[in-house]
């Protein structure tokens, strides 16, 4: 039997990422053959990964990488926040983002077939990572954005990489694009414009807003405060020419009833119409980037600010770790017990 030296164990660990004991056992089983040991570790890793396949991985990191006129934002999941801070995990995320940006896959299936620097497919690299790190590690999703030479990327990550954003700005500069991505990270828009919102979605969100008003009115009634009116509209898409004309007519009637001279109406009506638009586009403000108040200049919406600097936003992508994943709510004792059981089974 070949002698299993510390040097041999170290070499195998460097090539496979395996722990000391796993590397030593693999070398013993393969009589010191490095290549056979790597294959054995890979097979064992696949078995371990299979055991972990049904676990929920809702923690993790986003990765952002810009490659010339192509940018990628990705999400990679782990089971715990602790592992998400692991150096090997962070390197895997960053490498994956680079491979995605350079490979430009059309979907997750193509992404998983891309070749990593290690020579493995992306899919195999994640199986290996699951075995080595000891938690389910999964590549969840990616977005690719392309720009022209005249456009600018804004790449930004927030909260230690839990949020990743890419935006594209036309006729601005990289600094503006970066600021816009910071806004997107903080304010969570889901689409660019009200034109992208589904009609039924707007109706449902408006109903929810009015439900909140009803709850607020119950509290106001208890302290003899006047009730707040329901919102009639939630999006600019609902504000037809007839609706806007009627709103202006109502304002004029109100001014006449108050005895305001007609000669000053032109100074009052624009402000009241702005208020009408603000009050009746609450859904837009929550979900569309252009309608949101810009965090870098709260006197303007994003759309108004971009117009003031003769720029426009073309596209954006925002990923936040764990969006849409249902995470099991285990108590601490159950979590410890599960961890110990997993350790015994590995």
Swiss-Prot record:
It holds the Pfam family EF_TS. GO terms for molecular function: translation elongation factor activity. Its main location: cytoplasm. One of its GO terms (cellular component) is cytoplasm. It comes from the Bacteria. It is found in: Cytoplasm. Residues 80-83 are annotated as: Involved in Mg(2+) ion dislocation from EF-Tu. Keywords: Cytoplasm, Elongation factor, Protein biosynthesis. Associates with the EF-Tu.GDP complex and induces the exchange of GDP to GTP. It remains bound to the aminoacyl-tRNA.EF-Tu.GTP complex up to the GTP hydrolysis stage on the ribosome. Belongs to the EF-Ts family. PANTHER family: ELONGATION FACTOR TS, ELONGATION FACTOR TS, MITOCHONDRIAL. This is Elongation factor Ts. The gene is tsf.
């Amino acid at each position: 039997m070949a002698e299993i030296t510390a040097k041999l164990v170290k070499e195998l660990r460097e090539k496979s990422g395996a722990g000391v004991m796993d590397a030593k056992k693999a070398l013993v089983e393969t009589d010191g053959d490095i290549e056979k040991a790597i294959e054995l570790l890979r097979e064992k890793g696949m078995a371990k990964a299979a055991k972990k396949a049904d676990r929920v991985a809702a923690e993790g990191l986003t990765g952002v990488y810009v490659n010339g006129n192509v940018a990628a934002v990705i999400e990679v999941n782990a089971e715990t926040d602790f592992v998400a801070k692991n150096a090997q995990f962070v390197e895997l995320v960053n490498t994956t983002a680079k491979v995605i940006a350079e490979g430009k896959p059309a979907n997750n299936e193509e992404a998983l077939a891309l070749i990593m620097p290690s020579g493995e497919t992306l899919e195999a690299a994640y199986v290996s990572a699951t075995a080595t790190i000891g938690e389910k590690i999964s590549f969840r999703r990616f977005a690719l954005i392309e720009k022209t030479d005249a456009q600018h990327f804004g790449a930004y990550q927030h909260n230690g990489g839990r949020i990743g954003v890419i935006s594209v700005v036309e006729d601005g500069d990289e600094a503006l694009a970066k600021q816009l991505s910071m806004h997107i990270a903080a304010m969570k828009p889901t689409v660019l414009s009200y034109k992208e919102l589904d009609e039924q979605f707007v109706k449902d969100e408006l109903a929810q807003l009015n439900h909140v008003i009803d709850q607020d009115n119950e509290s106001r009634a208890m302290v003899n405060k006047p009730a707040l009116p329901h919102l009639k509209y939630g999006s600019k898409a609902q504000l037809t020419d007839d609706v806007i004309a009627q709103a202006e007519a109502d304002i004029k009637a109100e001014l006449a009833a108050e005895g305001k001279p007609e000669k000053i109406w032109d100074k009052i009506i624009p402000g009241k119409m702005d208020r009408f638009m603000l009050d009746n586009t609450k859904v837009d403000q929550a979900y569309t980037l252009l309608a949101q108040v810009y965090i870098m200049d709260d006197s303007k919406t994003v759309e108004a600010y971009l117009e003031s600097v003769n720029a426009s936003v073309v596209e954006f992508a925002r990923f936040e770790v764990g969006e849409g994943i249902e995470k099991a709510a285990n108590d601490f004792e159950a979590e410890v017990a599960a961890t110990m059981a997993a350790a015994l089974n590995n």
